[in-house]
Amino acid sequence: MPDVTFKVDGQTLTAPAGTLLLEACKSHGIEIPAFCYYPGLSLQAACRMCVVRIEKMPKLQTACTTPVAEGMVVVTDSPEIAQARKATLQLLLGNHPLDCPVCDAGGECELQDMTFKYGAAESFYAEPKNHREEQKWSPVVYFDRPRCILCYRCVRMCGEGMDIFALGVQNRGSSSVIAPNIPAQLSGVIENGVELAQLDCEQCGMCIDTCPVGALTSGTYRYKTRPWEMNHVATVCTHCGDGCKTTLGVRSVTDGSQILRGDNRDKSGMNGDFLCNKGRYAFDFANNIERLTSPLLRKNGKLVPVSWEEALTFAGTRLRDLREERGSNSIGVIGSNRTTNEENYLLQKFARAVLGTNNIDHHRTADFVTLATSLQGTTGTFASQRDVATSPAILIVGGDPTNQAPLTAWNIRTNVRLNKARLYIANHEEIKLRRQAKAFAPVAQFGYGAFVKSLAEDNDFSKSLHAEPKLIVLIGNELRGGELASLIKALPNASFALLADYANSRGASDMGLLPDVLPGYQSLQGSTIASEYGAADAPGLDLLAMFDAAAAGKLSALYVVGSNPIKRYGIDPAALKSTFLIVQDLFLTETAALADVVFPAANLYEKSGSVTNSYGDLQLVSKAADKAGTRSDFELIVRLADHMGHDIRTLVPFGKGLRADMGQTRGASSGEADRHAVWLTANNMEPRLSPFDPFAILDEIQRLVPGYDKLLRLQLLSGNDQHLVPASTGLVQITAARKDLVLPSADNLFTSGSLTRYSPMLQDVQRHQSTETAGHLASAD
């Protein structure tokens, strides 16, 4: 839209026609206070804090509902306006409890900030304040009614943003109160003899984060600490494949540091302010008492704690001996889709350059190999997460973004609501997003191949898709191999993305945790990286074939990093009875319990590096916390290679640069590291890196991995995401005979079956949801 020119407090400003006055002023650094206004939600005009004086208007106007107009003259700060805002605050504070010293919102409360600014420090009410008992609506949502200022942000966020409508308003006028969708008499939840109202929703906590005061508080955070007592670290969520940025609130404890809160209130990252229940609450797996904190070695049939040196020496010596006695091809390596790109790259390099084997794989939750192969040489492209939020048309084939990729579902809903995007769905079951769909094509459970063929037929669904000038196609893990390739061929000029299940599923494939391709999906024969590694040119065993070989007594050793194949694939533990097994993980999983050596590993919140989400968006992972007794997977791989007698300088190109101590000891706390980094950058130099620093291998990734050669190092280290696409040719794909290599995790909003089973809060939420479901069924009877 064309720009209009207007004046605010004597300044001449411009903004696109139709822009709300409040947003236009904000973009020019002019603050107008507001409680009820929230970007992306419908306009409420309930709080009257944003009132301004507009020339030729008879009374004060709300800036949150007034669009800018040509020639408009506005005053945002005057004695009249200040008095109006002060009067509004006095009304709000009239019955607001003086809980600031104990309220979780203290220090972050918008009401607190505005009270200090506009001077409503004394109440002109003599009557005692009304008191109401705090209500527990779910394990993660608590409501304190007297604190509520009736801005209705929570109601609109739940209905418009999340499409849940679990919150509403009871009564009218001054008697209005926010209430959950399950009243006390129907909830079936009784505490201390009193029936409690309950929330039947996705437990995302978005209502809590949008609340400007402390009326809604989090069950994981309440009464534990203050905002100024925590370090706030921006990193990437460790759960699904969407790649949400999360800001973790961390406090020091005796055995390292403890994560106390997860949110993204600064709205940075591709997810804005959105986080699902896993991103917001399921960080507590890191503090689980079952975390491994000491290496374990099997002695007399039992795993017992030992020193790091004993465990590493035994594992390294045994692995080296087995390689020499039975050959490199008798050893297998299984990686993880929850470890960083740098760790995944290093692990496959360890397998190929140290062990000398291509027997390497990971739990694949989507067929990225076929996606990369099928898009080569076509007019199709790789979609980014941001494309989903802006594209005029979206097709979902299989999958359920609401459960599997909540940010994707959020972006689709927002795009449909705000931009009128057209949503098409082809699925074998009803999914929540059908409510936003323009068209729905029912598919038989195993009939996606037939659906792909129908796209070439003369039917309304197919004609609508082919008529879309710009189409984003999101593909569930029901499609793989030939069916996936056929879908891509059937929709030329579209952009495609796969819905994978874990934080770095795409990165694990991109970095070469595969038996038949190298990093960047390069061929085992003739590529630059193949000659540099000196790796074998014959494809290795995939994950399932490794266990077949183990059962046949042909796999002498198996090194498992951050994976639990015994549980995930339902493998008979007896298959490993004659295989030397090394496992590094956070917990004593079903696979780790069978191991000869177990190394306690750090999780994604306890390390630095990068991850690539399902769309190919590369993001920085920052170390937020520590756990005593654990080490990063990167360090463990390097130390294991060292204890095998391998020259680790050929594994990790560390040590280049000027000094090794800058930024690692005193510089980290004095600010000297930052100054030194700036000086080195200005002189086109880099600091010397430790062999355990994941960024020591970033240059090699840039040099050797097609697609990642386009990454901008400074942009990555600054925390900005970058959309990368594979750039290799001559790729391979999973054949029809190996479809079982892609195994969906049967993910849902409340569990992924791996990390979340160690999250007490998510387990509590899951029990709550089960109780709600049972209660509804009983009510229906």
Which residues are covered by each model-predicted region?
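N-terminal leader/propeptide and maturation segments of large enzyme subunits in energy/redox metabolism
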Residues: 98-127, 626-723
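N-terminal cofactor/phosphate-binding cores enriched in small/glycine residues
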Residues: 4-73, 79-84
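Feature of Fe-S/electron-transfer and energy-metabolism proteins
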Residues: 1-3, 11, 16, 102-122, ...
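Catalytic alpha/large subunits of respiratory electron-transfer oxidoreductases
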Residues: 93, 97, 144, 150-151, ...
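Glycine/threonine-rich phosphate-binding loop and adjacent beta-strand/alpha-helix elements that clamp
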Residues: 385, 606-628, 641
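Short, surface-exposed charged micro-motifs
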Residues: 12, 166, 247-249
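Fe-S ferredoxin-like electron-transfer domains
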Residues: 48-238, 242-244
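Short beta-alpha connecting loops at secondary-structure transitions
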Residues: 6-7, 70-76, 192-193, 232, ...
